[in-house]
Amino acid sequence: MSEAVITLHGLTKRFAGMDKPAVAPLDCTIHSGYVTGLVGPDGAGKTTLMRMLAGLLKADGGNASVLGFDPIQNDSELHAVLGYMPQKFGLYEDLTVMENLNLYADLRSVTGEIREKTFARLLEFTALGPFTGRLAGKLSGGMKQKLGLACTLVGEPKVLLLDEPGVGVDPISRRELWQMVHELAGDGMLILWSTS
């Protein structure tokens, strides 16, 4: 059995003015080496849960642990091991592919030879090598998706949160992403993929 890397105990979140909780008390353990699906209709709380796991939103009750770190109390430690790709891929459309990668590398303090090797690996992995000078805003939906994934992987996370990564992209691009993500899981990464 794989090592458990995310554990949730009674995790809840409510928003003011809402009759029902955004996330009802949730208990689960998620293991590395798998792609775990977080499936539900729009408004079910998938993005809210992802944001709590990424330390971007504080839970109202219960607790979460990601690789032993509390997402709020240990945000610096969590940032070093977690990659989060939001629904819109988190890209700067007025920057080129390479400028987006450089920005994310700067944010993750990836420098020098490690940066060069990481970029070479990610550009090959995503097949974006020929497009490094293209503005992100001029990429197709599938290419934006791949760039978003590459930017998320710059820091070599152990946990990858993908919030609705297949929305707005063609079936071939979704299949390619699915294959890339399964390869990462096969290498021991924990992947949580939300979808409707």
Give the location of each predicted region.
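Primarily ABC-family ATPase nucleotide-binding module
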Residues: 1-4
